[in-house]
């Protein structure tokens, strides 16, 4: 895609990966340097943290569909603009339609913006279950943030437990 300028600074687009009919879809903000180099979603230390969180719920990575709101990394890891998010919106919408997950875990503010078109603070969005194309959306903190802010891991775990309860319902 060359819909916005992000394509110029990336090595490759990170489209998504995982089970084609997964119950869980995890949507991150944007690929980072680790993902751009590896060519996979949620790579590096943040990916390892996400894998551990999912394993704690009994979910191997292979049973989850992983993607990002943006398909290209942003320069220096800066936050995405609303225009950049809008350029990738159709890809994300199509992924949700194809996978048909039972729950979407939106990990980060950009992921929440892409799915919910909301500019509310992440702390407020994570307090209630939202919806995208009829699929419940649980908003939580991104793994890279949790690596820097250990105190919020308990909140993220609570959010994952809410998502798990929606899948089991």
Across the structure, where does each feature detected by a protein language model lie?
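A polyanion-binding, active-site-adjacent surface
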Residues: 1-169
């Amino acid at each position: 895609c060359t819909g916005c300028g992000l394509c110029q600074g990336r090595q490759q687009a990170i489209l998504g990966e995982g089970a084609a009919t997964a119950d869980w879809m995890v949507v991150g903000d944007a690929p980072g340097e680790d993902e751009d180099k590896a060519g996979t979603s949620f790579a590096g230390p943040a990916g390892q943290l996400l894998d551990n969180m999912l394993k704690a719920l009994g979910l191997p990575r292979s049973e989850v569909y992983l993607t990002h709101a943006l398909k290209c990394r942003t320069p220096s890891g800066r936050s995405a603009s609303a225009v950049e998010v809008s350029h990738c919106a159709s890809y994300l919408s199509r992924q949700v339609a194809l996978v048909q997950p039972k729950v979407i875990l939106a990990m980060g503010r950009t992921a929440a913006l892409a799915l919910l078109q909301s500019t509310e603070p992440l702390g407020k969005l994570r307090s209630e279950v939202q919806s995208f194309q009829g699929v419940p959306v649980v908003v939580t903190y991104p793994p890279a943030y949790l690596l820097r802010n250990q105190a919020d891991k308990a909140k993220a775990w609570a959010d994952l437990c809410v998502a798990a309860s929606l899948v089991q319902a």
